[in-house]
From Swiss-Prot:
<dbReference type="GO" id="GO:0044780">
    <property type="term" value="P:bacterial-type flagellum assembly"/>
</dbReference>
<comment type="subunit">
    <text>Interacts with translational regulator CsrA and flagellin(s).</text>
</comment>
<dbReference type="GO" id="GO:0006417">
    <property type="term" value="P:regulation of translation"/>
</dbReference>
<keyword id="KW-0810">Translation regulation</keyword>
<dbReference type="GO" id="GO:0005737">
    <property type="term" value="C:cytoplasm"/>
</dbReference>
<dbReference type="InterPro" id="IPR024046">
    <property type="entry name" value="Flagellar_assmbl_FliW_dom_sf"/>
</dbReference>
<keyword id="KW-1005">Bacterial flagellum biogenesis</keyword>
<dbReference type="Pfam" id="PF02623">
    <property type="entry name" value="FliW"/>
</dbReference>
<keyword id="KW-0143">Chaperone</keyword>
<comment type="function">
    <text>Acts as an anti-CsrA protein, binds CsrA and prevents it from repressing translation of its target genes, one of which is flagellin. Binds to flagellin and participates in the assembly of the flagellum.</text>
</comment>
<dbReference type="InterPro" id="IPR003775">
    <property type="entry name" value="Flagellar_assembly_factor_FliW"/>
</dbReference>
<protein>
    <recommendedName>
        <fullName>Flagellar assembly factor FliW 2</fullName>
    </recommendedName>
</protein>
<comment type="similarity">
    <text>Belongs to the FliW family.</text>
</comment>
<keyword id="KW-0963">Cytoplasm</keyword>
Amino acid sequence: MNYFLKAPILGFEHISGVRLEKIDSLFSRLMGQTNSPMALDMVLVNPYCLREYSFVIPKYIELLLELDSHSKVEVYCVVVLQKNLEDSMVNFLAPLVFNSKNGFGAQVALSMMDYPDFGFRDPLKSFVIKERERA
């Protein structure tokens, strides 16, 4: 699905349109819709599949995305891929929030002070191992 970014992705402020493609129930791919030399192409993860994950969407983001009780909100976190997938890092402090009802999206920068259990480079393997131990 295509989205218009109402608040930019950090480091990609020049990109306002993105395409979100689901790879599977865990991973998705986000691509910028621009011919800029600084193209956006990143892997995202559904944080709720990895851990307990809850945060308050700031009021200004609610307003920008026109969120209401009927909105279909999707939340993803950026994955910094490594050669070995399990060594990849997840940024839980800067989630991407999408309102699929109207096609708006934004990145939210969370404070470590407010969310001390969230990291910006948590190794994916720490969550994969926990999942294997449950099986």
